[in-house]
């Protein structure tokens, strides 16, 4: 009987160490997504300034610029693709607050865990699986804009799709780890 108690204690210690290590991994993921999200947030300023220049050039001087218009589009796409995981981390994505807002910490953790494992992660895995060949084809031909004076870097824009999915999946893993750790302590 004492042997089983020792074994149970050892398993509990190993389990605690594993969650400690997993929480450290979640912390690293959080730092990565936070740094990328904060850096990408500056693209909002770039988008606003470039759009302002475009409007002034068009309506005051009658000038248009395809490459500047595409730069605004690319910066806008990069802003959303690179900041989405950070938005997930800080709880900025839309959710049904009717149930979630009044739920206990345990229930919220359970919802977060199930949502990450059965909704977010499978969808991101499929998106990565489909987006990598899509981006690779674009890189293989160094795809450029269909407009003559457009940007010659469509392949970079398409690379943001699997990168977005990877960052979201990583942040989903971090959320699942934190939720599982919270559920384990209850």
Each language-model region and where it sits:
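Alpha-helical transmembrane segments and membrane-interface helix-loop junctions
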Residues: 3-186
């Amino acid at each position: 009987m004492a042997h089983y108690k020792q074994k149970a204690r050892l398993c509990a210690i190993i389990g605690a160490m594993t969650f400690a290590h997993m929480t450290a991994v979640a912390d690293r993921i959080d730092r990565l997504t936070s740094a990328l999200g904060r850096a990408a947030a500056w693209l909002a300023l770039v988008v606003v300034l470039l759009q302002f220049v475009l409007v002034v050039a068009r309506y005051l001087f009658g000038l248009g610029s395809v490459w500047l218009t595409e730069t605004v589009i690319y910066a806008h796409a990069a802003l959303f693709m690179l900041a989405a995981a950070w938005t997930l981390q800080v709880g900025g994505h839309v959710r049904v607050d009717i149930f979630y807002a009044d739920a206990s910490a345990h229930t919220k953790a359970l919802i977060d865990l199930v949502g990450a494992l059965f909704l977010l992660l499978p969808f991101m895995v499929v998106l990565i699986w489909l987006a990598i060949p899509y981006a690779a084809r674009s890189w293989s031909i160094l795809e450029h804009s269909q407009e003559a004076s457009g940007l010659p870097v469509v392949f970079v824009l398409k690379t943001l799709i699997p990168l977005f999915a990877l960052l979201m999946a990583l942040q989903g893993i971090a959320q699942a780890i934190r939720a599982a750790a919270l559920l384990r302590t209850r």
